[in-house]
């Protein structure tokens, strides 16, 4: 059959000449898991996606330290509504649920694998169904879908959505290295944090790139410009850096810093107006 006949039949004769070889792109690494032991001795298995450009395939030190911070004083989350941003495995959310939070929304980028992995961690925790809810969320976007997950169980066992409720507690663990997203994170705190006394956003982080620590800390300038109060409340030196062999000051790489972001009195009063 002549080449012209091939073209007439819709076959250009090139076959797979321009197709990428099967091994052209490296395969996505398989999912992994890590464990975390609570103060009670309970061991949580934390599944992670094999790889994500949003870094959801790591269990960050900030997540472990926030979890410990909640365990040290359970009243920080007991009976409260909690939203975790950029959660990955969602360890702080699981811990909050175990400690008696009323409702926890564990959120990360709306990638199917990430959300399904968060759901798997909730399911395997065993007793958090109806308490911890995974959601896909892009920082700075409309928070209404997150707020819609705040529910209260009545004495009859029926769940009733409470209009106008926001989150008592926000968790931001190891998110500040995404410098371009600081404004969007501040927007979400503004929109999602309940405007009442006692509401707080816990921002824990390590400067994994020590030479850019000033850019990590610039997040707090952004939230101060919005009118929030900022206070450092915690610091812990880990035994070793999360990533072996990274350049820069090892002591900074081992340090987890914890800050609280709260509403000032004048903005609380403005919210009541």
Locations of the language-model features?
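S-adenosylmethionine-dependent methyltransferases
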Residues: 1-273
